Amino acid sequence: MAQIPPSLQDMVNRFNQAQAQLQSVLLRKQQYEAELKEVDKAISEIEKLSPDAKIFKNVGNFLVPQTRDAALQELKERKELLELHVKTLSRQETMLREQLDKLRDEINKELARLKGGEAAKGGG
Amino acid sequence: MSRQDVRQEIQRLIEEYQLVGELLTNLQAQHATVSELLEELTTALDGVRLLKGGAGERLVHIGAGLFVKGVFETKEVLTPLGAGYHAFLDLDNAERVLQERIEEYSRLKTSLEENIGKLAERAEQIRQVLERLGIR
């Protein structure tokens, strides 16, 4: 079997690296989105409660009492942070997808060029 | 198709078969977890509905088939709202929260079952092709 040229090997390595990065980004994004959904659910439930409702927050093995306003403020801050994470990861995802498309094109061009060269050799 | 092409195709099919197998194992584990959660939620919902029956003596399971007599006059239950927060909700609202969660997990379970079915079908297709090619 013909030896893969170093330039092509380098492109393939970069492609695999970008693919692994994309997978990692997608996994993290999925985790943040799931957490965001959970936070949204908690916010909507707490908003239905009366201002003097007895609310408790999980802290390790303890349930610590908290006011409705404090709980809502904390959850809304957490929501903002999660949305920021998701936004950042979405940007990274777009960049990596573009990078992969570009590398895929380059690899295909290089393969076509190599095949063309081999055909010319065979014909000669 | 040259012999080398056939070899490459067989290699590709074997790799796909392994990947599908891994995905199936993963989804089946998720399905088991979701089923367990659903069972737990349904038990909790039954408990809340029992409490809605009004005050009175109840037999409460404390594990290993042991029950104790208890008198309940509860109007509220401490209910998980998500994201690590709990609140005392009246029995109607506690029932609603549990019901919503049950519906959510039921949808997830159905979706997992559909995906497991599709993957199992694909695995069987590959297995048959490989068998025809003399690979077991």
Curated annotation (Swiss-Prot), chain A:
GO terms for biological process: chaperone-mediated protein complex assembly; protein folding. Keywords: Chaperone, Cytoplasm. One of its GO terms (cellular component) is cytoplasm. Coiled coil: none annotated. It comes from the Archaea. It is found in: Cytoplasm. CDD domains: Prefoldin_beta_GimC. InterPro entries: PFD_beta-like, PfdB, Prefoldin. One of its GO terms (molecular function) is unfolded protein binding. Pfam families: Prefoldin_2. HAMAP family: PfdB. Molecular chaperone capable of stabilizing a range of proteins. Seems to fulfill an ATP-independent, HSP70-like function in archaeal de novo protein folding. Heterohexamer of two alpha and four beta subunits. Belongs to the prefoldin subunit beta family. This is Prefoldin subunit beta. It comes from Pyrobaculum arsenaticum (strain DSM 13514 / JCM 11321 / PZ6). The gene is pfdB.
From Swiss-Prot, chain B:
GO terms for cellular component: cytoplasm; prefoldin complex. Keywords: Chaperone, Cytoplasm. Its main location: cytoplasm. CDD domains: Prefoldin_alpha_GimC. It is found in: Cytoplasm. Belongs to the prefoldin subunit alpha family. Heterohexamer of two alpha and four beta subunits. Molecular chaperone capable of stabilizing a range of proteins. Seems to fulfill an ATP-independent, HSP70-like function in archaeal de novo protein folding. This is Prefoldin subunit alpha. It comes from Pyrobaculum arsenaticum (strain DSM 13514 / JCM 11321 / PZ6). The lineage of its organism: Archaea, Thermoproteota, Thermoprotei, Thermoproteales, Thermoproteaceae.
